[in-house]
Amino acid sequence: EAAQKGIHWMRLTAKGRAGHGSMMNDENALTALSEAVAKIGRYNWPQRYTKVVKDLFKRVAQATGRPYDENDLRPLLREIGPTARMIGATLQNTANPTMLEAGYKANVIPGTASAVIDGRFLPGYEEELNSTIKSIIGPDISIETISRDIALEVDFAGDLVESMCSAITEFDPEGIPVPYLMSGGTDNKALSDLGIIGYGFSPLRLPEDLDFMALFHGVDERVPIEGLEFGVKV
């Protein structure tokens, strides 16, 4: 892992006119918020390819014999199996609604309603994320930053990288080390503030039929013991 998306968790709040649920109300905060959240969830973000992402897909194309089109890398996603679930998210910014909060009783129209959005931006595209969210929701819904962290991207080169690559091929001669951009984040963000260049290195060898990415924060989150044993050797 030679790059990471940045993080912007934000709370959206809509205000309206509180009232009885049995009456007409054209200033329903929950209705306004729901419409904004739906627009965010369905928004089709433009493709943005960073240096690390291009490097990854060039190597995928070389390994599979498939054509490489630097203007559209999405066709190559089918060549990387379940990993495409995460890698696909590194071709663009993302913003996923994750939490909703409004009201306290079935027959009361709330005066306010809020939602939490998990925004992730590519290196160099934080402003695109923020400005797009603002344009989607309009001026009547407020945005509050819950948490924000930087994006990272470093060169996939140097003695440390060579050591990682040689360790993998020593225990798996058919293994092809490639860089990738992580859709989440690690402590490397904090280390970068100290001038320390860090890489993610998790040498797990996983069964071909395991959709490993689907297990992240999912039901029965786990990792095969054989994969860990391989990683310890590496």
Predicted feature descriptions by range:
Residues 2-231:
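Metal-dependent amide/peptide-bond hydrolase catalytic core
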